Amino acid sequence: NMKYTDWKKAFVDGVKDGLTVATVGAIMKAKRELEPLKAEMFPEYLTDKKERKNTQALIDYVNACENADPDVVALYSKMGAMENIRANGIPMKVSHGKGYAVNYRYYTRNDQLADVELIIPKLAGDDLTGQVVTTLHEEMHLMDMFNRSDPAKYSGWFSSSHAKLSSFFQKTNTDIADDIDSLFEAFDKECKRITAEINAELRTATSTLTDQYYARTISYSDYKKAFNKIKREASEQIDYQCRNAMGGGISSLEDIYDALSGGSARDAGLVRYGHGSKYYRDIGKRAEETLANYGALSVVRPDLIEMLRKDKPELVEALEEVIQDMLKKAGG
């Protein structure tokens, strides 16, 4: 029954005075041993020739996360075993375009799935944290979908059908603990600094390009093409750096609080990242996004989950229960 303050004091600050040093397993409610992920644990469409390198980069990153939640990692290891989209003859593909998501189409006459597309980042760059968080987020969505109530249909995902988790989203809650609010403020300030710095570089590059155009050293079509390219690259760099800022994953924690607020937190500017009230009008989406964010953070940023646990212990308990229930269903 170690309190969060004692946990932080002992295992973050390194002060163990007056504490009985328990094993990690005892502290983490006797969770299973952390076992490494392997490529054969994933669905075939994530390990084929086209996707093998990307999935291996994800596996290598996750296996290096020593403090990852063993139960959540165990659930990701069941992804291949629980796959029921292509296994049921439904077309399924993986791509790396913009707008990361699990997209699907269905037949309106009977609600049956027509096809599914998993859109995830192509892992690249010096810091993969933000991209790994996004990939784990989307792959948790995929597992949530695998465990839908009727495998033939598109709806009834496991999280939104889970009574305990769903109960948290029947009413909105806009409360944010002081330490988390301070974290969000610092994150917003850092993202503003990143944005200002990259936009300043963009203005300089644009000015140089404009001078070349007026000097007639490049054509208008070349100018337009180059301008669109540097503008796109600046936008991508802002997103890349902000998602990695302050250790990465803070955007996911913000989205959990946005879901709890029904989207009003993002609408009001209390969080920088979130889906907003138009999206979260669908109560089921609040549970789905929260589980996906929890899954990613439990692997990459378990310290942020401990902050969430301190503020919303019953929510984290419900999320842990969802993970356990999905593991049981998968035979784990």
Placement of each model-derived feature along the sequence:
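Hydrophobic, membrane-inserting alpha-helical segments
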Residues: 1-39
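Non-catalytic nucleic-acid-binding interfaces of large nucleic-acid enzymes and RNP effectors
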Residues: 50
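Active-site-flanking segments in enzyme catalytic domains
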Residues: 45, 55-62, 66, 70-332
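N-terminal low-complexity, Pro/Thr/Ser-rich intrinsically disordered segments
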Residues: 37-47
